């Protein structure tokens, strides 16, 4: 799959932007703060319904505007598809596919991308929440129906936490909470699907991760990934603010039927402590993935270069997995300001690793940072304006309209 045309209205620093895109590599180049990352951020939003830079949609709407619009013309095997999302400041977001209204969470069914940015170093060095988000985004891109499962789990978790907080405030005992049993069952039923799906995903990622790491780093440091499950922990961690999970190796759980009894036992075991804390202490929202290099945890032991190579390999492995599974061609691969962070050898190896993808979109502040064969088609960005780009294809006006 490739993006033939991207159109933005009131997105970030763009009042309006239109750019035609070609197969192969396209380089968006411009000084920092000019808006090049905003273009690829918009495409990332279409496939993940989130930004790699901010946690709230509001920041994506241009100051003074009430909504932002992202439109893309997609092409695969000679067929075209128009997708659109309207991000609203004071109402729910809206979406269209070929002018037909749809739920925003359905968009990943039609468009997949894998974006790598400097912020992704936190996948190796940061908190578990980022690693969970990586897995869940990839789950939805591979199996779109899981977007509903993840949403259902969040709702059940919120309801259960509300009940636990209320019970703590009123000093209620465990045997006085019949309603909690209902939410326990629902949390276990939904959460077990997520745990199993993540486990199967990590298992599928492993061989691709090993190949991608070797391609980027040029050495085999034995990269590995293993799920760590809070339902297996005796102590799930005291500091929920810091997101310390206390989870244990759960690599064997790839079927929800195997997870259910273990999750059920963990919920029962932790109920007294959860009533004390007013918080659900076990479940997929508290899990992690342990990354290792040379048998040691990458977090805390890997060098800066090794951490970069591991993070890059994770994204390349994700892209290869989507490419292998997809019936609509390769995911669009997005490299946001990546080459500036790499030495010359890694730049060359990364360029070689991404060359085979149908479409690769790259941003850079310095033209010379990007290997020449990836920079042949350059789009220059200056002060929120696109210059020196191919003439945009005919597209609907991005101003005034929105997703119906």
UniProtKB/Swiss-Prot annotation:
InterPro entries: DNA-binding_RecF (IPR001238), DNA-binding_RecF_CS (IPR018078), P-loop_NTPase (IPR027417), RecF/RecN/SMC_N (IPR003395), RecF_2 (IPR042174). ATP binds at residues 30-37. Gene3D superfamilies: P-loop containing nucleotide triphosphate hydrolases, RecF/RecN/SMC, N-terminal domain. SUPFAM superfamilies: P-loop containing nucleoside triphosphate hydrolases (SSF52540). GO terms for biological process: DNA replication; DNA synthesis involved in DNA repair; double-strand break repair; SOS response. It is found in: Cytoplasm. Belongs to the RecF family. The RecF protein is involved in DNA metabolism; it is required for DNA replication and normal SOS inducibility. RecF binds preferentially to single-stranded, linear DNA. It also seems to bind ATP. NCBIfam families: recf. HAMAP family: RecF. This is DNA replication and repair protein RecF. It comes from Clavibacter michiganensis subsp. michiganensis (strain NCPPB 382). The gene is recF.
